[in-house]
Regions:
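Non-cytosolic coordination micro-motifs
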Residues: 1-45, 89-180
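Compositionally biased P/S/T/G-rich terminal and signal peptide-adjacent segments
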Residues: 2-13, 40-42, 47-80
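Mid-length scaffold segments of soluble, non-membrane domains
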Residues: 70-100
Length: 180
């Protein structure tokens, strides 16, 4: 039987963000990098471990080797171009704008300088919520929660001196960075 491959329409939108590079399915990337995978083998990505938002259409976080403690490709599906986004990590999880604001405007903010994902989020927050820098979104946070998500990626399970983040908003990967 022929292998079913999901097709992509990469001509719809020009990609200029951190996910502009297209790589082959199964590629391991350096820490903090994100790329697109458009040659997806149907149904063979791995196990869905999380969805954001939890209801309706959204992004699915897929672990290519669930149960492994080593680094491996992860995939995020749900983009209009039908290409998954991939990165390499030992552990990955979604984080909401509410969680980001608790970390960014609370005590941890005194330790970590502003990163590319923080700066990109400030721009989104200002346009959606009207909130100034270093101030939480407020009552309009639920609007951000519908189409904005962070992904935190860790090189190993346990203590990590550094980690990476990706910010997705309204179907676009806006920023990716490495902290620590």
């Amino acid at each position: 039987l022929p292998r079913k491959t999901l097709r992509s329409n990469t001509s719809k939108r020009k990609h200029k963000g951190p996910d502009a590079q297209i790589v082959a399915f199964g590629t391991s990337l350096p820490p903090g990098m994100v790329a697109r995978v458009c040659d997806l083998p149907g149904g063979r990505l791995g196990k869905e471990i999380e969805k954001f938002p939890t209801r309706g259409r959204g992004y699915k976080l897929i672990d290519s080797k669930p149960g492994s403690s080593g680094t491996r490709p992860f995939y995020v599906t749900g983009f209009d171009d039908n290409c998954a986004r991939t990165f390499t990590a030992a552990l990955a999880l979604f984080g909401s704008p509410t969680m980001h604001e608790q970390l960014r405007y609370g005590l941890p903010s005194k330790v970590q300088p502003y990163s590319l994902t923080d700066q990109a989020y400030e721009g989104i927050k200002r346009s959606v919520c009207g909130a100034s820098k270093n101030k939480p979104c407020g009552e309009k946070i639920t609007k951000l929660e519908k189409n904005t998500v962070f992904i935190s990626m860790y090189d190993r399970i346990g203590s990590n001196a550094s980690w990476s983040n990706i910010l997705i908003h309204d179907g676009w990967v806006l920023a990716a960075d490495r902290k620590g």
